[in-house]
């Protein structure tokens, strides 16, 4: 180990995220002055098996959501453990923090403290190596730009409207490159705004920059998006595919063991009936991906869904897998889902995130790298998506700087990669 790449100083602070809530930011400085900074995101609809975000619980500050304890853990305990360690040895750095925490869910030091440090160390190491982060993590083979899943209509927990599913997304698969895909998405976003205005519907945007109009049903949300795609001059299916994030744990009634769809007149569905409901949507509309179609504990339902649609469309586990190796391997063995959503703060360290991506790839599951509803200007996930050739990224709509920052970083990466950059479009769903 060269003395130069040793960690000299770690400094954390409390900053504000895109929802006005506090979050953790960490700065790491190495002996040679190399510097890395990372800010941690936070979710609205959280899986019950996620790593724990440490919040202060002091109602006098930020309604109990302060993160001064997590900040102190970084500045004192984590700094003590990591000072003098080699920043180039990411696995060791992360393992030292995990050992010091000692819990299964990072509840002692806080996943926000550990993750902020983990990402900042990687950034400082990349700076030291004179490499962009995607190249430092992914080596010379990192060159695939992800197909963006753009969340242009919000419902569920992300919006105050009558739509059950949390996200309705567009995927610009007909584009030649990322830059063109981003433009297509932006044009559809703008034409959706005018379609909604024409129907005298609200065009204010939600947490992730999508519209949250008060539509009468889930199907109506799909229909207005199809209108917007055509109005923008594109063809559904050929140019743009659709994706849903049902976030069904949010409308699952545990006591009745039923799924209650408010937008469908509070109709109750069994797991099998909900699977049929999805199959019907997929047969009618150009839907290529459904995330969290069933509750995170409804493994039987997930099995049904996978048997029925697993060869046709991408079935993404988010709350189901929570970016966790144990959960994912259970899914792989049970033949459940065929894709995993990757959220760095669900697992809470860079090396564990990369291990989950690796395991998914080996099992021929696709990877979707994702933001959270509470974001910052941090663009690490853009680099992780390219570093791992994940093929897909989910980072919100075409408005709000907390979302756009990620897209703009991908534009810069694509430009830097030049002719070696790859954008796979429909081919990204290689396992269907």
Swiss-Prot record:
Protein name, as recorded: Enolase
Pathway this chain belongs to: Carbohydrate degradation; glycolysis; pyruvate from D-glyceraldehyde 3-phosphate: step 4/5
EC number(s) reported in the record: 4.2.1.11
Free-text remark on how the cofactor is bound: Binds a second Mg(2+) ion via substrate during catalysis.
Function: Catalyzes the reversible conversion of 2-phosphoglycerate (2-PG) into phosphoenolpyruvate (PEP). It is essential for the degradation of carbohydrates via glycolysis.
Binding site for (2R)-2-phosphoglycerate: 166, 343, 372-373, 394
Keywords: Cytoplasm, Glycolysis, Lyase, Magnesium, Metal-binding, Secreted
One term under GO cellular component: cell surface
Main localization, broad class: cytoplasm
Record: active site: 208, 343
Subcellular location: Cytoplasm; Secreted; Cell surface
Family annotation (PANTHER family): ENOLASE (PTHR11902:SF1)
InterPro entries, per database record: Enolase, Enolase-like_C_sf, Enolase-like_N, Enolase_C, Enolase_CS, Enolase_N
Cofactor(s) the protein requires to work: Mg(2+)
Organism listed in the record: Leptospira borgpetersenii serovar Hardjo-bovis (strain JB197)
Binding-site list for Mg(2+): 245, 291, 318
One GO term of the biological process aspect: glycolytic process
Matching Pfam families: Enolase_C, Enolase_N
């Amino acid at each position: 180990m060269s003395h130069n790449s040793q960690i000299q100083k770690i400094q954390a602070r409390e900053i504000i995220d895109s929802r006005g809530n506090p979050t953790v930011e960490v700065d790491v400085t190495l002996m040679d002055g190399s510097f890395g900074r990372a800010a941690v995101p936070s979710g609205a609809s959280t899986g019950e098996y996620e790593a724990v975000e440490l919040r202060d619980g002091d109602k006098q500050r930020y309604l109990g959501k302060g993160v001064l304890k997590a900040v102190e853990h970084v500045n004192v305990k984590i700094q003590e453990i990591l000072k003098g360690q080699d920043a180039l040895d990411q696995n060791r750095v992360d393992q030292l923090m995990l050992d010091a925490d000692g819990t299964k869910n990072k509840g002692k030091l806080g996943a926000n403290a550990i993750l902020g440090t983990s990402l900042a160390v990687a950034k400082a190491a990349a700076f030291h190596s004179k490499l962009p982060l995607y190249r430092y993590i992914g080596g010379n083979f990192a060159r695939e730009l992800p197909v963006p899943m753009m969340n242009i209509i919000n419902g569920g927990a992300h919006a105050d409207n009558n739509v059950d599913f949390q996200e309705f997304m567009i995927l610009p698969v007909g584009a030649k490159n990322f830059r063109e895909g981003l433009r297509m998405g932006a044009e559809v976003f703008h034409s959706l705004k005018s379609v909604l205005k024409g129907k005298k519907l609200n065009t204010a945007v939600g947490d992730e920059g999508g519209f949250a109009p008060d539509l009468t049903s889930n199907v109506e949300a799909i229909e207005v998006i199809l209108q917007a795609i055509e109005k923008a001059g594109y063809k559904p299916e050929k140019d743009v595919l659709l994706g849903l994030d049902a976030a069904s744990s949010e409308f699952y009634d545990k006591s009745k063991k039923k799924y209650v769809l408010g937008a469908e007149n509070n109709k109750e569905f069994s797991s099998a009936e909900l699977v049929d409901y999805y199959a019907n949507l997929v047969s009618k509309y150009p839907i290529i991906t459904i995330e969290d179609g069933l509750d995170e504990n409804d493994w039987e339902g997930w099995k049904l869904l996978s048997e029925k649609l697993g060869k046709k469309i991408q079935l993404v586990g988010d709350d189901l897998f929570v970016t966790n190796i144990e959960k994912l391997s259970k899914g792989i063995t049970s033949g459940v889902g065929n894709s995993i959503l990757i959220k760095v703060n669900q697992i809470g360290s860079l090396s564990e995130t990369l291990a989950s991506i690796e395991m998914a790839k080996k099992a021929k599951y696709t990877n979707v790298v994702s933001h959270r509803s509470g974001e910052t200007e941090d663009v690490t996930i853009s680099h992780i998506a390219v570093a791992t050739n994940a093929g897909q990224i989910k980072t919100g709509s075409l408005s709000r700087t907390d979302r756009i920052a990620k897209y703009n970083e991908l534009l810069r990466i694509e430009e830097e990669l030049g002719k070696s950059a790859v954008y796979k479009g429909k081919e990204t769903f290689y396992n269907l």
